[in-house]
Amino acid sequence: MPLVTRNIEPRHLCRQTLPSVRSELECVTNITLANVIRQLGSLSKYAEDIFGELFTQANTFASRVSSLAERVDRLQVKVTQLDPKEEEVSLQGINTRKAFRSSTIQDQKLFDRNSLPVPVLETYNTCDTPPPLNNLTPYRDDGKEALKFYTDPSYFFDLWKEKMLQDTKDIMKEKRKHRKEKKDNPNRGNVNPRKIKTRKEEWEKMKMGQEFVESKEKLGTSGYPPTLVYQNGSIGCVENVDASSYPPPPQSDSASSPSPSFSEDNLPPPPAEFSYPVDNQRGSGLAGPKRSSVVSPSHPPPAPPLGSPPGPKPGFAPPPAPPPPPPPMIGIPPPPPPVGFGSPGTPPPPSPPSFPPHPDFAAPPPPPPPPAADYPTLPPPPLSQPTGGAPPPPPPPPPPGPPPPPFTGADGQPAIPPPLSDTTKPKSSLPAVSDARSDLLSAIRQGFQLRRVEEQREQEKRDVVGNDVATILSRRIAVEYSDSEDDSSEFDEDDWSD
């Protein structure tokens, strides 16, 4: 439907009923002439409106041109009369002055009531007025205008504004989500790109001739041929090389001790059966001593002669020596003497059986296990150990004497200070806890007030957002094309309501 801005009336000059007169021709002529004069009058009125608007716009344009001319004249005078030798501008003066910034005002609200043309306004005034429903607005509890339920000119704008603001919030939430994921997984973006599959290798193989191309059946699952030719001329199988040169990793003593025969059977056969490559035999030979050395601590007689030469055994025997002290510490009653002798000397086993006969050691054994689990609760047992440890030192006074004091002292020192610290901590912590609780209670009491203040600030922030198309669109464009985290501060509080 076209919007008629100016309508010249009357539109029809001669379409009228004639009165009962004798001279009808003269009557029609007079009526037509009168209607023409009316049309000229309405035309002159619209011409006045048109030329009046043109005059207003021309006057505004002239004032802008005159102000610009004045600025150019002043600038020209400053440029021509400025002498750089006499007047020196300091760097501070240059920095204090603000740079030129264009303040372009965007045209908006073109179809507002104030910008409504006069003829359109006259046409609008000829329409029927809406019912006076605004009189019921004071009686509404929701605060909405009653007339908007009947007619709401701003309905479409409000709908569009709500959609734009929601889209902006969604964009900001998505950006914050990506930032959070990027912080949690910094290496997520460093994904290796998928390799492009080409037939270049295939054509390179076919370049020498079809008869030299190896079929896929001849290649294993790993892409290498099953048979390998070594430099010394021997041929070995890939499976054989893997089985002999890479023996399974040695297990713990507990796992290897129950089945020594199984480990011994596995080690010797590989060199005998798969004896094609010389390197494999060497690898298996080296692997044998290592395996036998691990098994040797549990079964010394059988393991060394079968799996390993006598040479490596003494070299690898010292390392396993430290492990035995922990078992006597757990299973044998006298824990302090074994630990003291185990650290300086290599042969700890003979020392434990010499001390058990003493009756003093038979009584303390039950207490030591509980202290190992809970030192601070039972301080007396550690103190009793030095008294019991006094008799044994006479046979070898220097060695056992030093170890017990540090061991017992280390046990005794932590046992005594904890109670002191425990007694001091409650004294210092009690007032702090009471203060924290009082602060928490005061914060809870002020919860409703704080929540109200937050709601007021949120409402103020929403009101700050411009209620026009240009501001909303500029805000959305800035959010979409910006990567800074400051842009999300405006809608951070909205996450609480999600």
From Swiss-Prot:
A Gene Ontology cellular-component term: cytosol
Single annotated GO MF: protein kinase A binding
This protein's UniProt keywords: Actin-binding, Cell membrane, Cell projection, Cytoplasm, Cytoskeleton, Host-virus interaction, Membrane, Phosphoprotein
GO biological process, one term: endocytosis
Occurrences of domain WH2 (ranges): 436-453
Modification Phosphoserine occurs at: S474
Location(s) in or outside the cell: Cytoplasm, Cytoskeleton; Cell projection, Lamellipodium; Basolateral cell membrane
Tissue expression notes: Expressed in all tissues with strongest expression in placenta, lung, and peripheral blood leukocytes, but not in skeletal muscle.
Biological role stated in the UniProt entry: Downstream effector molecule involved in the transmission of signals from tyrosine kinase receptors and small GTPases to the actin cytoskeleton. Promotes formation of actin filaments. Part of the WAVE complex that regulates lamellipodia formation. The WAVE complex regulates actin filament reorganization via its interaction with the Arp2/3 complex.
Annotated family: Belongs to the SCAR/WAVE family.
Assembly behavior: Binds actin and the Arp2/3 complex. Interacts with BAIAP2. Component of the WAVE2 complex composed of ABI1, CYFIP1/SRA1, NCKAP1/NAP1 (NCKAP1l/HEM1 in hematopoietic cells) and WASF2/WAVE2. Directly interacts with BRK1. Interacts with FNBP1L (via the SH3 domain). (Microbial infection) Interacts with human cytomegalovirus protein UL135.
Recorded domain comment: Binds and activates the Arp2/3 complex via the C-terminal domain. Interacts with actin via the WH2 domain.
Name of the molecule in the record: Actin-binding protein WASF2
Gene that produces this protein: WASF2
